[in-house]
Amino acid sequence: MRRVFPLLLLLALLLAGCQGEAAPAVSYDLDQVPAYAGEPYVVINDNQPFFGEEEYTTEAFETYSALDGLGRCGTAYACVGEELMPAGERESISSVKPSGWINVEYGGQYLYNRCHLIGFQLTGENANERNLITGTRYMNVEGMLPFENLVADYVKETSNHVLYRVTPLYEGDNLVASGVLMEAGSVEDEREGICFNVYVYNVQPGIGIDYATGASWAEGEQGEIQSSPTPAGTAYVLNPNTKKFHLPTCASVEDMKPENRTDYTGSREALLDEGYSPCGQCKP
């Protein structure tokens, strides 16, 4: 029987002298989450976030839980507005080694990303160890990023605020989260623009993960463990001006000015660590 994991939102101070109120505690049981069945996320609580009405505010803030005794991240909680969004370029986050960080390449791509709980485009956090967990590429790009983009686009288009909370859920003392609970509700329009509550699975199709340690292996057709593939480079096209990277076949590459194009062969993880972000069109 899995343990009931309280979403204890006792939020630590991120910046010295900055005060933040803890959000009400919410309990959520991983046993209530259906087993992964091929989709990156599942809707929770009829897509309604667990926020209390008293939490909705137009005052922007961001708070990140202190690491626990195992070095694991807890809840990240914010009221996202334009005033929190980054004004500068994304910086390297390679200095952070989140719990369970045992990274291996499969098919030329690293299994894990340093996943922002609250995406860089929302609050501009770079190498904040309280906001980075060990997460698969699949969870990061297919599961979390579409919801982050939804919130970012809404805030930029309306100048409204969005109450936003991401909670990693762990089974027992596992170092790698089984997934993350993502909640969001737009403030000024009373959830008309943004309203979701989803659980995103921390899985990678075709790869087995030992969540206790972060170790991984390739799964064969019959489920047998295969040896890890030899690391190999992948071809990308970089735009140093926008800090985006693309697949060579991406339509955006054709429109790129020659002086803004750099051909690159290497790992996706290295690009993310250097502050590049994937193109939203080709999703490399």
Across the structure, where does each feature detected by a protein language model lie?
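Sec-dependent signal peptide recognition
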Residues: 2-10
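Residues immediately within or flanking Cys/His clusters that coordinate Zn2+
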Residues: 12, 130-133, 276
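C-terminal motif of bacterial Sec signal peptides marking the signal peptidase cleavage site
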Residues: 13-17
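Bacterial signal peptide processing site
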Residues: 19-22
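N-terminal module-boundary/linker segments of secreted carbohydrate-active enzymes
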Residues: 24-66, 234-236
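Intrinsic-disorder/low-complexity loop/linker signature
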Residues: 39, 46-47, 108, 173, ...
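Domain-level detector of nuclease and nuclease-like folds
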Residues: 50-227
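Mature, structured domains enriched in cysteine- and short glycine motifs
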Residues: 222-284
